[in-house]
Amino acid sequence: MFKTLLLFLLIPSGVLAQEGKVDATWLHRSISPPNKNDVQAGTCHYKPIFGEGDPDNRILRTVTRFGEFTVAANGKCQAALYDRQEEIYFVVEGNAVLHYADQTYPMRTNDFTYLPPAVSHSIANASGQMLRVLVMSFKIPARISIGAAAPAPKIVNLDAVKKQTVEGHPASVQYKLLLGPRTATRDAIDQAYVVTSFFWMDFVPGGTNFPHHHEAAEEIYLVMDGRGEIVAGGGTDGIEGRYPAAAGDAYYFRPNCTVGFYNQNKPGATANILAVRARIPPPDEDD
């Protein structure tokens, strides 16, 4: 007993400290369009950005995956069906065929749709050009009652959604409110259980959405075009950490993390961000 205790005391404290890993407050990934020559005909490839397939997936609470399907000409992705999971598809590039239950629906660049639990769905490419689709998946806690799914998906194009300012944010950024909860009425699609907002932000030169935080939600930003500075966490000043960001930069923010964006302050500088936010369950209700 004494020898064992002595051996433990002789172990350097640094060795013991190395056993643990501190969870990140936010995550950054950078994505780029795939090389068309690297995509085999007839295939569907999934690239994880956050969540499933990413090494830091354990810190996500409600988001199960955020990534991109690359579907080659005449390719088709495997069908999915989740009992307690909802998804959003957003077509980044190309023309798609959405399989929803036993029906098919066309989708084109900048189309988006909501996919409820308990409905089989998949995406296919019937064209001769490459297809890229963002896929976002969210876990629905057992305490939430799930109703009957819509017989057909609602598909909306980004261009059909009006820009507007949002209370609490400066007029230097305009929003397109794409998707929200079933209890809402302001979004183009209001059918979600845990997704509180899926939205597009358009910043004028020098514009910002003013850094803020959400105490009970996690959020993802994807810079679609333009350049600026992402705000992530408190930084060295304890207020906001600012990091250069350009098209293809994606950020995941844990609950209560400071989040925001500053566009470049020069003539003609525009920036657009696609963002999604989902509420998290209380700590004692995690599934």
Predicted segments — roles?
Residues 18-63, 78, 128-130, 137, ...:
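A short, N-terminal "cap"/entry segment at the start of jelly-roll beta-barrel domains
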